Amino acid sequence: MYSFHISATLGASLYCRSNHFEALEIDSWESSNVFNLVVNCSEEKGIPSILILDYCFLQIFYLFVKTFFACTYIIMLAFQVYIFLKEKNNFFIFRYKTEPLYILRWLRS
């Protein structure tokens, strides 16, 4: 789980820097198999935008990811977080559900 903390922080930092934001605060914590990432990016005008990511993983995902090397895993997830943040608005709340139907709907969107 620590590798996801690292990769999510890298992806969020890359998102803020590429959009000419300054990352004021990047905080992450884990509670009951739910990973929370809070990114507070601010524009030069001082208007903050708060990004909240909640991730809850399946055991199947863990088994799949364990086949990769740790560095590849961190880089892959960092770019996934970066691409996800790039596609969303400045303010959003995203929750990754554990139910298979929610996962399939999220993958299709």
From Swiss-Prot:
It is found in: Membrane. GO terms for cellular component: membrane. Keywords: Membrane, Transmembrane, Transmembrane helix. It is a single-pass membrane protein. The chain crosses the membrane at residues 63-85. Partially overlaps RTT103. This is Putative uncharacterized protein YDR290W. It comes from Saccharomyces cerevisiae (strain ATCC 204508 / S288c).
